[in-house]
Amino acid sequence: MSPPVATESMYKPTTIGTEAHDQALAAMKSNQAAPAKPVFKPEPAVNLEPIKFAPIKEHQVQRAMVRRYFQDMEERAISDVIIVGAGSAGLSCAYALGKARPDLKITILESNVAPGGGCWLGGQLMSAMVCRKPADKFLDEVGVPYEDEGNFVVVKHAALFTSTVLSKVLAMPNVKMFNATACEDLIIKPCPINPGVQRVAGCVTNWTLVSLNHDHQSCMDPSTITAPLVCSFAGHDGPFGAFCVKRIASAGLSEGLGDMRPLDMERAEDHIANKTREIVPGLIVGGMELSEFDGSARMGPTFGAMLLSGKRAAEVALQSLGRVKVEEGEVVGSAK
């Protein structure tokens, strides 16, 4: 037998007089009244000097920022070296290059607001940063402490390396970083040294928020930075991952991408550190971007090759610049 169907006649609401209802509600509230909350009374601060900031106008802040930013953009319209990506490899390259040649104008492009790439943490969001030897020598040079575990060393927190090398790089007077700025294309021109060969001659830049919204708003043209040499460490993931090697492939300047292979730490680190190189005239590639180009294994949460790939890129860059004659940021021939 089916259960009876619920109808209005079966379930009539109970009604009581308004006065009785109010009395019952008041009694219930009085019985359930919450105890008085304790009041925190802070102890008064004593013997503290008052803080009084110097006066300032809002327009002064605006002009101070705008003037310096656009002075930097004007000055760096021609650079000696552009570094794409301020992760562990890119920052290591900037440090080694800036230290070796303080006369070079080194411009760093970082698409994120926060530089550092994946080197704020170790593997799976854990803190420690593992570096296989001989990368410990670079840590010594930069001044990052670590624990020695035999064949490898451990920095207690990856952010300690990133913040240390970042502060040293940005303190160099010849280094300028534009963060929240994407490399969204490359400048490519005929190579004056090798007829019929194309040469990377700089970067096409835009603010990252603009680059990521081209699908929503048309006609948002970029800016450019001219340089005889670009060093790219754009990584392997994210919206701009491996950007430069992908652009080289799409422009028909390489046979294509090798695509990163599955993880093998030993093979991966040896390959990345030793194969960092100038893949086409004017473009040096290192770090995990190189694994996408060469089709080498990924290395996972070990960072030694990132550091030494950046350092090797700086060495390759110095040799490359020594072979060319440069006028107004463009290679015009071979060095005599």
UniProtKB/Swiss-Prot annotation:
- Please give an example of a GO cellular component term from this record: nucleus
Listed GO biological process terms: thiamine biosynthetic process; thiazole biosynthetic process
The entry's free-text remark on the cofactor is: Binds 1 Fe cation per subunit.
Which cell locations does it reside in? Cytoplasm; Nucleus
InterPro entries reported for this sequence? FAD/NAD-bd_sf (IPR036188), Sti35 (IPR027495), Thi4_fam (IPR002922)
Q: Which domain of life is it from?
A: Eukaryota
The record's comment on protein family reads:
Belongs to the THI4 family.
This protein's record includes keyword Transferase: yes
GO molecular-function annotation terms? cysteine-dependent adenosine diphosphate thiazole synthase activity; iron ion binding
Q: Which UniProt keywords apply?
A: Cytoplasm, Iron, Metal-binding, NAD, Nucleus, Thiamine biosynthesis, Transferase
PTM-bearing positions, type 2,3-didehydroalanine (Cys): 219
| Chemical reaction(s) catalysed | [ADP-thiazole synthase]-L-cysteine + glycine + NAD(+) = [ADP-thiazole synthase]-dehydroalanine + ADP-5-ethyl-4-methylthiazole-2-carboxylate + nicotinamide + 3 H2O + 2 H(+)
- Positions with a binding annotation for substrate: 89, 110-111, 118, 183, 221, 236, 288, 298-300
PTM remark: During the catalytic reaction, a sulfide is transferred from Cys-219 to a reaction intermediate, generating a dehydroalanine residue.
Q: Look up the record and name the cofactor or cofactors this protein needs.
A: Fe cation
EC number(s) reported in the record: 2.4.2.60
Instruction: Say which species the protein is native to.
Output: Puccinia graminis f. sp. tritici (strain CRL 75-36-700-3 / race SCCL) (Black stem rust fungus)
Q: How does it assemble?
A: Homooctamer.
Cite a single Pfam family from the UniProt record: Thi4
Q: What does this protein do?
A: Involved in biosynthesis of the thiamine precursor thiazole. Catalyzes the conversion of NAD and glycine to adenosine diphosphate 5-(2-hydroxyethyl)-4-methylthiazole-2-carboxylic acid (ADT), an adenylated thiazole intermediate. The reaction includes an iron-dependent sulfide transfer from a conserved cysteine residue of the protein to a thiazole intermediate. The enzyme can only undergo a single turnover, which suggests it is a suicide enzyme. May have additional roles in adaptation to various stress conditions and in DNA damage tolerance.
According to UniProt, the name of this protein is Thiamine thiazole synthase
